[in-house]
A protein has these predicted regions:
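Generic secondary-structure signature for well-ordered alpha-helical cores
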Residues: 14, 18-21, 42, 46, ...
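Residues forming the flavin
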Residues: 1-7, 12, 91-262
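Ferredoxin-type iron-sulfur electron-transfer modules in oxidoreductases and energy-metabolism complexes
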Residues: 1-13, 33-65, 81-108
Length: 262
């Protein structure tokens, strides 16, 4: 992970020009207010920077590590001199400072009497649960996996997103009153009773297939299956030998050069 000290982080943030039309904000799927939290950061106002970031982003410690950083690709400094503000790394630094300095304090809101079931404990389900819980709804998350996180836990390698970072946030959500029912397969024809509404947040766990010559040959695997299996092995799970995806000693061709392929 990037290890620039706080002084260098502030210098990076000071490079933000607070453009009249902030393309960084416009291209961010979350609508993050990059110029505003960069301004607070460059002035050393870490708490304020986190407050601005938290307005639009429930989990900046995740996105600050694995987001494709569309904001940086559209940064005017990127377009003019190919050296954008390090927005994503600044975001991660702000989130880590918030945990370290105690800015993140679990709050159990006053309940409004409504119960919501969230199906899926991936990033979408967790975000929905966090927002609904903050509004006073009593939220229970269901997921078929033994641990929450979805692709954050089972699809992203540890070197990009350490699992203790996920666990730390789950502890906050639990302390705020969100309940987790893990290892539960939900039948969409028979939803769990006792809830006023349901949010289906099952994500996209199915890999994209290719209809090309040779697709039927043996030894072809989806990256998601391989990454998920490796993460589960690191968590202590075991698999029969015939189910293991092992490339040791073999010549490997990777189709796709994005983050997953890398």
């Amino acid at each position: 992970e990037q290890t620039l000290n706080s002084h260098d982080r502030k210098l990076q943030a000071s490079r933000c020009m607070e453009c009249g039309v902030p393309f960084c904000h416009w291209t961010c799927p979350l609508g993050n207010k990059q110029p505003e939290f960069q301004d607070a950061l460059c002035k050393g106002k870490w708490r304020e920077a986190y407050q601005v970031l938290n307005e639009t982003n429930d989990f900046p410690e995740f996105t600050g590590r694995i987001c494709p950083a569309l904001c940086e690709k559209s940064c005017v400094l990127k377009l003019s001199c190919d050296a954008p503000v390090t927005i994503r790394e600044n975001e991660a630094a702000i989130a880590e400072a918030a945990f370290r300095e105690g800015y993140i304090v679990p709050v159990r809101p006053e309940r409004n009497g409504w119960k919501i079931a969230v199906i899926g404990a991936g990033p979408a389900g967790l975000s929905v649960a966090a927002r609904l819980n903050a509004c006073g709804y009593e939220v229970t998350i269901f997921d078929s996996k033994p641990m929450p996180g979805g692709l954050l836990r089972y699809g992203i390698p540890n070197f990009k997103l350490p699992k203790e970072v996920i666990d730390r946030r789950m502890d906050v959500l639990k302390a705020e009153g969100i309940r987790f029912e893990m290892g539960v397969c939900i039948d969409m024809q028979k939803l769990p009773a006792g809830f006023d509404a349901y949010a289906v947040c099952t994500g996209t766990p199915t890999a994209r297939d290719l209809t090309i010559p040779g697709r039927e040959l043996k030894g072809i695997y989806f990256a998601l299956d391989m990454l998920a299996q490796q993460n589960r092995i690191l968590d202590g799970e075991t698999f029969p030998k015939e189910q293991l995806v092992n490339a040791r000693g073999k010549r490997v061709l990777v189709i796709g050069g994005g983050d997953t392929g890398s």
